[in-house]
């Protein structure tokens, strides 16, 4: 599948929710139902076993071999790949952080790759994301 980086605030086809917001919500719902793999090792295993339904890769990964590996596995098995600009942002979205009293993320750990194996319940965010992936 073709991969491309999502620009901040890029409008979704339906116009109700942008793709980044939809992706954030879908990742949170997948985490709730234990359908989220985080980190290169877990993601590579899920991609190789073909249990992955969607792969999210940070664009600023410090090791180019990681990027090539994930892109190759996604292309080989026909899994959709979405790139986000920052690994810290992806780390916050997949729960690799502490939340303080005000609800702000603290001590965010960067995440190079995340894979969704189970989406969880059907939602508007999932529909927006699927429409976006179909149009690419």
UniProtKB/Swiss-Prot annotation:
* Record key words, sorted: Ribonucleoprotein, Ribosomal protein
Q: Which residues cross the membrane?
A: none
GO MF: structural constituent of ribosome
What InterPro entries has UniProt attached to this entry?
Ribosomal_eL30-like_sf, Ribosomal_eL8/eL30/eS12/Gad45, Ribosomal_eS12, Ribosomal_eS12_CS
Q: Which GO terms describe its biological process?
A: translation
Gene Ontology CC = ribonucleoprotein complex; ribosome
Which Pfam families does the record cross-reference, listed alphabetically? Ribosomal_L7Ae
Family, similarity comment: Belongs to the eukaryotic ribosomal protein eS12 family.
Q: What protein does this entry describe? A: Small ribosomal subunit protein eS12
* Species the sequence originates in: Cyanophora paradoxa
